[in-house]
Amino acid sequence: MELALDDDADDLQGGLTALVVTVVELLVEALEQEAVRRMESGSLSEDEIERLGRQLQALEDELERLKQQEDINAEVSEFREDLDHVIRDAIEQLSEHETPSGHGSPESQRDDV
């Protein structure tokens, strides 16, 4: 998905809205993963779990409403695909630079004494 500067204002606004919604969706997913981690560790009370679940669901519902209202489902999906590829490539590049011990290349391991 590209945000071309020569697009008309509606296209630019739709693209920007799609980008913002995509980023917020990714943040909500990260929050959900953190909530699950905290639930599994037992650090949340039942009330906190309920409240957190309602808040996350409200965020997801609002994002879905916004995507429908602005007709940006396809654009959001495209941004997510593009971001998935970027992240996958970054992980692969990091993996290529890892040593078998998993601590990076020998050049990056200096003794600063």
From Swiss-Prot:
Region Disordered, residue ranges: 90-113
GO CC terms, sorted: gas vesicle
Subcellular location: Gas vesicle
A matching Pfam family: GvpK
Induction: Probably part of a gvpF1-gvpG1-gvpH1-gvpI1-gvpJ1-gvpK1-gvpL1-gvpM1 operon, maximally expressed in early to mid log phase. Detected at low levels in growing cells, at higher levels in stationary phase (at protein level). Not detected in isolated gas vesicles. Gas vesicles appear earlier when grown in static culture, possibly due to O(2)-limitation.
Protein purpose: Proteins GvpF to GvpM might be involved in nucleating gas vesicle formation. Gas vesicles are hollow, gas filled proteinaceous nanostructures found in several microbial planktonic microorganisms. They allow positioning of halobacteria at the optimal depth for growth in the poorly aerated, shallow brine pools of their habitat. Expression of a 9.5 kb p-vac DNA fragment containing 2 divergently transcribed regions (gvpD-gvpE-gvpF-gvpG-gvpH-gvpI-gvpJ-gvpK-gvpL-gvpM and gvpA-gvpC-gvpN-gvpO) allows H.volcanii to produce gas vesicles. A minimal gas vesicle can be made in H.volcanii by gvpA1-gvpO1 plus gvpF1-gvpG1-gvpJ1-gvpK1-gvpL1-gvpM1; lack of enough GvpJ1 prevents formation. A similar region restores gas vesicle production in H.halobium without the p-vac locus, but it still has the c-vac locus.
Sequence similarity: Belongs to the gas vesicle GvpK family.
Name the record gives this protein: Gas vesicle protein K1
Gene coding for it: gvpK11
